Amino acid sequence: THHPSSAASDVYKRQVLNAPMLKSTDGGKSFKRIRVPHGDNHGLWIDPNDNQRMINANDGGANISFNGGKSWSTQKNQPTAQFYRVITDNRFPYYVYAGQQDNSSVAVPSRTNGRGIDWSDWYRAAGCESAYIAFDPNDPVDLYGGCYQGLIEKLNIVTRKSRSIMAYEYLGLGSLPSDQKFRFNWNAPIFASPH
């Protein structure tokens, strides 16, 4: 979806939010891309008293600009994510695993040594944004994570080596259903056998 917004002080300026953020200074006749820290932009607040101050809401969190979008604040100072589903292991402290909307999957400790949990405590888990994640909850070394279109990744968190273990190696994006040997749901479930 496109969400146009404009600065109250200039009727010719328009911003359009989508995967990219676009800006027009001629009433929408032409647009140029505005660099933002994360894609899939969903909301933009422009200060009615100072159109150089903006807050952009996106799939990675929120970013602030004080110069009309020429530069933006970081996302590494906020615990924001949109999780599809969550699973935990049995360690102490336990870890929370989840696929993040339009981002990677992550493993996050439930606590740290007194300084709070920040991005340096997280690590990438297997799979992608739509991930179901499976592992041995008592020994979560090998992670299995899903992604859209039937993609499955096996990731060893000790060696950080990963490989695709998809049932049928084929990326179906952009192909006709009649040309596909198998069809997959957006996010097919993956479970670890208890045996």
Each model region followed by its residue ranges:
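Short coil/turn segments that connect the beta-strands within blades of beta-propeller domains
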Residues: 10, 51-52, 93-94, 140-141
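Beta-propeller fold detector
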Residues: 32-35, 74-76, 117-120, 162-170
